[in-house]
Amino acid sequence: MQLPFTTEQFFDLLAAYNEALWPALVVLWMASLVASVLLFSSRRPSDRWLSGLLAAHWIWSALAYHAAFFTRINSAAWAFAALFLLQGALFFWHGVVRGRLSFAPARNAWAPVAWVLIAYSLLYPGINAVLHFSVSRIPAFGVPCPTMIFTAGVLMLAKPRSWRLSIIPVMWSVIGGSAASLLGVRADYALPIAGVALALFSLQGRTDAKTVLEHVQLRPRFRA
């Protein structure tokens, strides 16, 4: 696969993005850290508040990163922006408006995976700083890849499991993961792992729900 821009152009773009918007990126990172700590503790954040944070992550990446910056070197970024806006709208509609999402520390086999992904997304700026020997010309926070990894972790702690909310994040794990090796962003090698984990988690939930439904339908009915 050949990208429509060079590695140098990509890292120059990241430098411009970080320089222009770093205060907002720090705020977004701090909000994500606080939400994660509260979710891990008994004082978990409001479900609507956490849904709103996920919506903010995706809408920010859509407008501030894809539309405002990435379109300068890649025309496909307009399509990416539309996908990210749609994902943000889905989180806002299902989680904030309708209150259909609930988040809590889970006690199952997926919980360790969820927390590793959340922790990795928060450490993502530091990992890139070490790997690239820079604090400016790197993907830091408020960009698509850590957004996807953070989202995957949080969704694994959500009820009910929603495969609809997982489609676009899993798609991005393929898109971003395929570009990671070409651009030399080794921190993004975690994207395919996060995508596979989220896909399996969501499909398992769909299978479990189907099994329950079939059990209810097949249960004998007795008339009084």
Predicted regions and their residues:
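Membrane-proximal helix-loop-helix units in multi-pass membrane proteins
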Residues: 76-151
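Hydrophobic cores of alpha-helical transmembrane segments in multi-pass inner/ER membrane proteins
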Residues: 25-36, 82-97, 144-158, 191-207
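Juxtamembrane "helix-exit" motif on the non-cytosolic side of transmembrane helices
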Residues: 63-71, 123-133, 177-183
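Central hydrophobic cores of alpha-helical transmembrane segments
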Residues: 50-59, 164-176
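Membrane-helix boundary connector in multi-pass membrane proteins
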Residues: 68-72, 156-167, 174-189
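Membrane-interface helix-boundary motifs at transmembrane edges
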Residues: 38-49, 71-74, 97-109, 157-162
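N-terminal topogenic module of multi-pass integral membrane proteins
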Residues: 1-71
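Loop-to-transmembrane alpha-helix initiation sites
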Residues: 75-80, 182-196
